[in-house]
Amino acid sequence: EENADHICKIVELIRKDDKNIPIYVVQTIYQSDQNGIGSMKMNNGSLMFQGQHKSQRDLAVFQLMGYLDEKLSDEKRVYLVPAGISMDSENAFVTEERTVNPYSDKTESVAVDAVHPAAIGYYQIADVIYSTLCGTMGEWE
């Protein structure tokens, strides 16, 4: 809720400066799989999402989308860009092969960065931004 409130505040501040400018809010994408989330490290080497499950991360993204939809639905010329539900989060991240556990020779593909997609993910996000722009530009006049 706090993140959504900050986004709504940005919209409010833009509106103070220009009451009619179209505002596009690109919704947060879903992160990679559990192994990517569970092993992603911050710059200092500590785990970024220690103890968190993909379902928790997904729920947070889902709730943020719903909250923004509720809070911004009455705003004129504010458009939500559904990047989260339009990007293939299962296949859009850079991966590397890792052993499934320290005692196994079996490997699996694990996301290197669970938050930021590979170029193909950004292309998918760009496509949905472009589609949203094309679908709403007629309302600008």
Language-model features: where?
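Loop/turn elements at helix/coil->beta-strand transitions in domains of secreted/extracellular proteins
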Residues: K16-Y24, L72-Y79, T136
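Structural recognition of the beta-strand scaffold that forms the well-ordered cores
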Residues: I21-Q27, V78-A83, H116, Q124-I125, ...
